[in-house]
Amino acid sequence: MGLEQSLSEETKEGEPSQKDQIELVIRLDDPGFCHSANMGLKKILEQGTCSSVSVIVATPWLDEVAELLRSHPEVSVGAHLVLNSEWKEFKWGPVSPYTEVSSIVDAFGKFFGSRRELMAQAPKVEEVEKELRAQIDLGLKKGLNFAYCDYHMGAAVNALEFQEIVEKLAGEYRIGISRYFGEKDTESIYSVPPDKKTDKAIEVLENLPPGRHLMVCHPGMNYPEMAAMTDLNSFGLKEMSVHRQAETDALCDPGFREVIRKRGIKLINYNHLRKEELHLMTRPFTAKPLEEVVRQARMEKKLERADEAGKK
């Protein structure tokens, strides 16, 4: 069942009333960062189920995903605001000239691999704003009709001052912010073993209560390109490409679509929410002040170095 059909169908006899309605945004994160991710997205758009796509624009494969999405106006497109580059073998940097945002990049002009590394540098608020604005502008220039924005690895909202920048930009560009429309995250299938992801995804849908929900997935194909990448973060998954292929397969599984139909789950996207509820957006959390986040990041790095020294 496609999003367009779900949005246009009127409630029929036997279907859930509005108070019992289950609304679901299926958001696909990270397209644009590599060809394998884009091809996972392509498969889902053609064979599977999704409603929103969050594109990283500061990455090498932006043009491919921009062209792909032009053929799929039924999904909403978001700016996946990024301040990290987490892959050991595949680094990217800012859209802005790196010399103009030096507090958010490493010695080679690339983003840091983790939030902690970034925050330990005491990034300048004005440079964060400059870069996030540049990312939105580049996406628009490439023809991406942004309906919303969100944040890769949480870095762009990791401090209160950053969160306020994201909210300011959303207001200026008249776009939504994912999770600000009351959508609650479903149980994640991210770390579920690949051979169990489809069953788990179906189980998640079967157990959704009435209300508005957000399912975040990470498309990809198990190509050599993606298989060669290693996450620099300790929580990163081994065989990441196998996991992302499994998420793609789950969203293309007939059983996944069937439970949406059977339960009368209404697929919604941020085009709809932006049009109808932009004025109703509410902050779902409040980040800690930048000074506190920087202090904590530096303390954690110090403890990590001490631990490493103790092991030698």
What does each of the following model-derived ranges do?
Residues 30, 77, 149, 215, ...:
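Conserved, mostly hydrophobic/aromatic
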Residues 177-180, 234-307:
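C-terminal domain-boundary segment and adjacent tail
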Residues 19-88:
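Active-site beta->alpha N-cap acidic-glycine motif
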